[in-house]
């Protein structure tokens, strides 16, 4: 009996010793998350705040039971309480949460940190591995291929589409001198129409019903993604599909069918153009060589397929990615931009007077050159995106042990969360950060500020290739609306309930009142 107890005691001591030894390198209770080290061996908490978890399992279950709006509030509170970029251990990962510009600059420019975080894996059923979610060689190839499609010459040719869609937007209120507008649905229809006609070369006039179905099912997909983000139990594909995945998968089918139809229609149009050129004896065997007019992004992909640079699945990946990004993120910027126009009458008047100075009432000179003269409108939009960034959080992960400038050594598979929302409201860079002040973006004020204190389009290697496109689209719609209407407030911005998500989500119906200018 004594020998048996002795062996049990030895076994217990061995296990305790093993746990002690392993726990130096791994946070065992965080499901063996490998620990972050410091370059000079200093205590970790001397370099970065450590967030204590709700349970003994580190931060694994901090979000469990919280709604999407509660998670959003929780993240903002963590940033406020820590006062600096902070560290968590959760579900087998170390998580470095960045809320300062210096660390953001280091990470976004680090040559080994181009791979998106594991959360982006939840996007793979929707976007697969297009330019947003791809990494390493595939990302470099796709990025190079797509960047040329946002060249200034091509953006110039898109302007007539933005004007036409903007006029179509205001024509919805023809015959109405005053109207209260719920922005989200109407603006998202405008941005979807615009991205389809510019980047895809397809008008949605005859596909309006299918476009509405796309938007409705996009919303279902977005809700499904958000549900997975906040509930670690749903991180496993099998568990998620078993309990709540059928609705999500049905929505995926609808949006993928829509994008495939867009691709098929564009292929037909390109072939018809080739036939027309043959008929007029100006034909060349290669439609990609002879085409001199507007060159939609989808055309570039179809031509790259002919050269063996991409296949049909690759085209679908990029079409789904560009449609989602171009439709959703710009829509968010416009919703909050128009809301702010309604809230800040003096700033709205400055925008209007600037527009009147540079843009004719018939819009005949509403081109890129004239848009570039609307400096105050640009500051207004930038300040809107500071307070309400379309992408409130960006994720990266380490593929190997990585040393940062701040002295932290992140182990392989560490997750890095760059909280754009908090950087944009960090009092270190922004005086009275909650106040709306477009003059923050005057050139002399920007010079005093860290360049990575404002990153609504990301920055560094993986910055948004469509940021000029987005600014052009937002400016054009705002010009057309302000030419026709004065925008009055309906909603109190303090009542807005934000929700966590890949993009900035909110529960409220954000509304404004449009009053026709000749009736004011």
Curated annotation (Swiss-Prot):
Keywords: Endoplasmic reticulum, Heme, Iron, Membrane, Metal-binding, Microsome, Monooxygenase, Oxidoreductase
Residue numbers binding heme: 325, 464
Primary residence: endoplasmic reticulum
GO CC terms of this entry: endoplasmic reticulum membrane
Record's subcellular location: Endoplasmic reticulum membrane; Microsome membrane
Keyword DNA damage (UniProt): no
Alphabetized Pfam families for the sequence: p450
Any one GO molecular function term: heme binding
Assigned EC number: 1.14.-.-
Cofactors, names only: heme
InterPro entries cross-referenced by the UniProt entry: Cyt_P450, Cyt_P450_CS, Cyt_P450_E_grp-I, Cyt_P450_sf, Cytochrome_P450_Monoox
Record's keyword annotation contains Magnesium: no
Function recorded in the entry: May be involved in the metabolism of insect hormones and in the breakdown of synthetic insecticides.
PANTHER family assigned: CYTOCHROME P450 4P1-RELATED, CYTOCHROME P450 FAMILY 4
Name of the protein this chain belongs to: Probable cytochrome P450 4p2
Species: Drosophila melanogaster (Fruit fly)
